[in-house]
A protein has these predicted regions:
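Metal-dependent nuclease catalytic regions and adjoining charged, substrate-binding loops involved
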Residues: 14-16, 209-210, 234-237, 264-267, ...
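Short nucleic-acid-contacting surface segments enriched for D/E, G, S/T with interspersed K/R
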Residues: 394, 436-454, 497, 543-561
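OB-fold (S1/OB) nucleic-acid-binding surfaces
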Residues: 405-436, 511-542
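Charged, glycine-rich intrinsically disordered N-terminal tails and low-complexity linkers that flank
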Residues: 1-106, 220, 226
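OB-fold nucleic-acid-binding modules
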Residues: 364-411, 464-518, 547-548, 557, ...
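A non-catalytic, helix-rich entry segment at domain boundaries
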Residues: 66-223
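Metal-dependent nuclease catalytic cores in nucleic-acid-processing enzymes
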Residues: 263-297, 450-454, 558-560, 565
Length: 589
């Protein structure tokens, strides 16, 4: 096998954590949002407070997948020149654009909250065809360069049927490469019918144009792979999912695909995004530096290049990103107040700002632009019994007992491997576990000892109370008074609050569905509940999703009894249990 280097564009979490997004990790999108507006990041990534879906958001997803499917195709041997490749690809582009347009229409119809002044039908099929053609033209620049370089350094090995990279570029004639193949029980998902295959010339023959396409094909996110295809920082606190990596000439060039134009409101974030990817590549590839980083814009076929960070800049970025990650973890926790005073809101000028610009002054006057009319039209909430304000929900507590029954790491209810144990007080016992992988690695250090647990988070799972430990929690041996804060108030296990009765109005709502790492489907609905003073994310999974939830829209009133109390990254998250939670709704109209 030819040596293509350790150019692996995907990896596994170092502590075995979730492959997908995690609120505890720094990602490129979280970073760029934070750099634009920290409060926008707080509400979007910590509170889950989103805006309505726009056609452009769906367009970016379906276009990227269609473009990647095009790159997977195998040109015929007889094709000649760049124009010949364009002619061969045109009917494929029309078919892929039609497929993408239908997929976008379905996604638009299934979205729970869409903008009112735009519609998916505003995007014509011709628009998608033109942008896929633009993507093709951007790639053909690489194909021509590869042809002019006699196929590049890997032509000989590829003609012999060898794969120069451990993670190959996806193509029609090869099966998909899963990050966790053992988690895919369906063997059919791991195979791929070879309906077509590349045609290679004998060794020593001049390179053909179809071979240049095959050699120049980059790695990209394989649309056949349902598992996240990410890079993970060795220390576990950062991850990123690259769009495309060019490797054909022995260099590493990182590319991000954009469906719009370079002059969009979010365009200024591209350089920060690519610098993060270049830094992450360096951190995950034994100090290897990328040779280039580019943005490919499909509206107009624009290629925007940036200078790659050098060694000194990489070191500065490491410190900067670690500091930002730390600031994110300590920015806020518990129940989030909303609205905030004007001095805590943003000015609303950064791309994506909406909820973060809303504020209310001491005279009760609202300030902001986006969503201002929505919140102003919502009436005050009547908090009569049995309902209580969100701010009354019990946060961190202190408990003590005997630590026993240690276990793990084993999967929690999110499928994340965590450490756990049992805390026993008299005849009562409760399960305690890490809030996420690596959050409290010393959990087992006081096995079979009497301990004091400080700043732990109460929750519930399958109708049984639990306690969660994170980086802010602490454990000391009972009796070590010098380590115990004075006047600490302990909570009896039987008095831990695991459910709440809440009421308020819906501010935002969204739904997601997909396939888990093991190939099983999942679905989720989440909305932001506002009681007039605070907000909380409310989530429902699988069988807990009913038509009443799917019919909710911003401004609707909702009353819930018996909703589960949970925490994600220390921020309140309420969870609907179809067996225990009772729901009443009233439409704003």
């Amino acid at each position: 096998m030819a040596d293509g280097g350790d150019a692996l564009p995907v990896g596994l979490p170092p502590r075995g954590g979730p492959l997908g997004r995690s609120r505890g990790r720094l990602s490129a999108s979280a970073l760029t949002t934070y750099l634009r507006c920290p409060r926008q990041w707080l509400l979007l990534y910590q509170a889950g407070m989103q805006g309505p879906t726009r056609p452009s958001q769906i367009l970016g997803v379906v276009l990227e997948e269609a473009f990647c499917e095009l790159l997977m195709m195998h040109p015929p041997e007889e094709v000649e020149g760049v124009d010949g490749l364009r002619h061969w690809a045109l009917p494929l582009i029309v078919s892929l654009a039609s497929k993408a347009h239908l997929a976008g229409e379905r996604a638009w119809e299934e979205s729970l909250w869409n903008v009112e002044d735009e519609a998916w039908s505003d995007l014509s099929l011709e628009t998608l065809i033109a942008r896929l053609q633009a993507g093709l033209d951007l790639f053909l620049v690489e194909v021509k360069a590869c042809f002019d370089a006699d196929g590049g350094p890997y032509l000989s090995s590829m003609r012999q049927g060898e794969q120069p990279f451990e993670v190959p570029a996806p193509c029609q004639s090869a099966p998909p490469s899963f990050p966790l193949p053992d988690k895919v029980p369906d063997a059919a998902l791991r195979r791929w019918p070879m309906s077509e295959s590349p045609v290679w010339q004998p060794q020593g023959a001049p390179v053909k144009w179809n071979e240049a396409w095959e050699c120049a094909r980059p790695w990209f996110k394989d649309p056949r792979v349902h598992q996240p295809q990410r890079l993970y920082h060795p220390e576990g606190w950062a991850s990123g999912e690259l769009d495309l990596v060019l490797r054909w000439d022995g260099r590493i060039r990182i590319v991000d695909i954009k469906s719009g134009r370079p002059g969009s409101a979010f365009a200024s974030s591209l350089e920060h995004q690519l610098r993060f990817y270049a830094w992450l590549w360096h951190e995950t590839h034994d100090g290897q530096h990328a040779s280039g980083m580019e943005g490919w814009y499909l509206d107009g076929a624009a290629r925007v290049s940036y200078d790659v960070p050098d060694a000194d800049e990489i070191n500065r970025l490491s410190s900067q990103y670690a500091g930002i990650h730390q600031d994110m973890q300590t920015m806020v926790e518990g129940v989030l107040p909303f609205p905030v005073p004007p001095d805590l809101a943003c000015d609303g000028l950064a791309a994506g700002c909406g909820w973060c610009s809303l504020s209310k002054d001491g005279n009760g006057e609202w300030n902001g632009s986006t969503f201002l009319s929505l919140v102003q039209d919502i009436p005050n909430v009547s908090l009569n019994s049995p309902y209580q304000p969100l701010s009354f929900i019990q946060g961190r507590v202190a408990v003590k007992g005997r630590l026993t029954g240690t276990w793990g790491p084993l999967p929690n209810h999110f499928g994340e491997p965590v450490l756990g144990a049992v805390l026993v007080v008299g005849e009562q016992h409760i399960t305690i576990e890490e809030s996420e992988p690596g959050a409290f690695p010393t959990l087992h250090s006081h096995h079979e000892q009497d301990v004091v647990l400080l700043d732990v988070l109460p929750g519930v799972w399958r109708d049984q109370p639990r306690l969660y430990l994170d980086e802010r929690s602490s454990m000391i041996r009972d009796g070590e008074n010098k380590l115990q804060p004075p006047d600490v108030q302990f909570t009896r296990l039987g008095l831990l609050r695991t459910r709440a009765n809440v009421t308020g109005h819906v501010l935002s709502i969204g739904g997601r569905s997909g396939v888990r790492v093991d190939g099983k489907p999942w679905s989720m609905v989440s909305f932001i509940l506002w009681d007039g003073a605070s907000i909380a994310e409310v989530v429902a999974f699988g069988s807990s999703i009913n038509q009443r939830l799917l019919d909710l829209r911003p401004g609707d009133e909702i009353r819930m009894t018996g909703v589960e109390i949970g925490w994600r990254s220390g921020v309140l998250q309420l969870r609907i249990d179809n067996r225990k939670t009772r729901i009443e709704t009233a439409s704003k109209s």
